[in-house]
Amino acid sequence: MNKKEDYYKILGIDKSANEKEIKKAYRKLAMEHHPDRSSSKESEAKMREINEAYEVLSNPEKKAIYDKYGHEAANNPGFNGFNAGSAGFGNFGGFSNFGGFDSIFEEFFGGSRSHSKQNSNYPYPGESYSTQVKISFLDSVHGRVISQKLDKYKDCESCNGTGARSKSDIKTCSTCNGRGSVEKLVNSLFGKIKQSVTCSTCNGLGQEITHKCPSCKGAKKIKESISQKISIPAGVISGQEVLLRGFGGPGFNGGPNGDLYIRVYVTEHPYYQRINDDIYVDFPISIVNLILEKPVVVPTPYGDEKIKIKSTFKNDQIITFKGKGFKRKNRVGDLKIRLKFEIPNFSSKVKKNLESLLSETNDSINEDFVKKVNSIK
């Protein structure tokens, strides 16, 4: 008998992979190899292999046994949780243990699984919504609270969320007998098979309402506009999302509302530039201040600061102000000013005075540099 391939290798993941990573890997492979989506002759066998690996690794109990005992545990009925049969992990010829390709595939991609809200009369959360907001650069430094009118769904108070005029108006669906789904024969690669589809009479709810609530018209929920405070955290990065729970679409069958994701966009500042959690700014310095070593005022997002200029400073030199950058939970950035020397506009009188004064200065900077360059052979 051929040795089974390692389940982690089949899904292309490490042993340290978490539940989310396992599911993501399965989804990708299922999209590629599912017989309904692939024309490859090997896709059917490959999909069996993928299903087997996912069925084990997605179950914490089965995964723990597999990690400790390997494939042999599959052939031992004494290992609880594997439901092992005489052919290893069940009869793959009929897909009895895994419900065929579709049992797991449809969990991800829709279809006849009970996980789908269209096919289930169980509580199901509403759809999540998204929107966006623009804030200034300084708002992203300090954070901001925005008051905004938002729509939120709540149970209709007139019918207590039943959608019916009265309790006596709620009947079990006569078509599906309360299941929310009906079975029909469909053509497949394996011939005609039974497929569970949403009951068209009750739309998967399992109930019929003879007289709808006059307030919500049978929707069970009503939409109200409320003033909501949205907290934008200090240090927010442009494109980052803020979550508001319960401000999405209405839940199904008593399920919770969906959520609202607010994507925050930060407008550019004409002078400040963000790099990671630091703030950079080109800072002009007059050569007069440089020569006289005068103190100058530096603007920061937290207020003005003073520094004393030294004649030893170089053009493009960076001076750091600790803790004056972005402040987030795990890190505090700095403000970094890049010195840019500038010559002020002197009046004619000042220029003459400077010329007279500087002519007496022994300035050999240019000559010294030329000599250094020419001395190199």
From Swiss-Prot:
Participates actively in the response to hyperosmotic and heat shock by preventing the aggregation of stress-denatured proteins and by disaggregating proteins, also in an autonomous, DnaK-independent fashion. Unfolded proteins bind initially to DnaJ; upon interaction with the DnaJ-bound protein, DnaK hydrolyzes its bound ATP, resulting in the formation of a stable complex. GrpE releases ADP from DnaK; ATP binding to DnaK triggers the release of the substrate protein, thus completing the reaction cycle. The keyword Ribosomal protein does not apply. Binds 2 Zn(2+) ions per monomer. Belongs to the DnaJ family. Homodimer. InterPro entries: DnaJ, DnaJ_C, DnaJ_domain, HSP40/DnaJ_pept-bd, HSP_DnaJ_Cys-rich_dom, HSP_DnaJ_Cys-rich_dom_sf, J_dom_sf. Zn(2+) 2 binds at C173, C176, C199, C202. This is Chaperone protein DnaJ. Zn(2+) 1 binds at C156, C159, C213, C216. One of its GO terms (biological process) is DNA replication. It is found in: Cytoplasm. The J domain is necessary and sufficient to stimulate DnaK ATPase activity. Zinc center 1 plays an important role in the autonomous, DnaK-independent chaperone activity of DnaJ. Zinc center 2 is essential for interaction with DnaK and for DnaJ activity. CXXCXGXG motif repeats lie at residues 156-163, 173-180, 199-206, 213-220. A zinc finger (CR-type) spans 143-225. It holds the Pfam family DnaJ_C. Keywords: Chaperone, Cytoplasm, DNA replication, Metal-binding, Repeat, Stress response, Zinc, Zinc-finger. Its cofactor is Zn(2+). One of its GO terms (molecular function) is heat shock protein binding. Residues 6-70 form the J domain. GO terms for cellular component: cytoplasm.
